[in-house]
């Protein structure tokens, strides 16, 4: 089943992921110093060792149009690490969602 885990607190950027049968062993938060807001869904491709080998921001559900937020989300997604699975497909596709929020 699809696993969704959430981390973060409002104002610092919430995160969640979906990658069937895998747990996140590292899910870095993006660093950003901006008042821009929105959600960026990054489509990820993960190898059997748990490494993210490809990431494309702007997947279905993305609300942020700012390219800076999308770039930061992609950078963080490429650093994510998931549990290895020898039974997984050679490349398993999932998503990581980053919610960039600020409060004035």
PLM features per residue range, with description:
Residues 18-19, 33-41, 45-92:
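A short, well-structured alpha-helical segment
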Residues 1-33, 71-79:
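Acidic, low-complexity proline/glycine/alanine-rich linker and hinge segments
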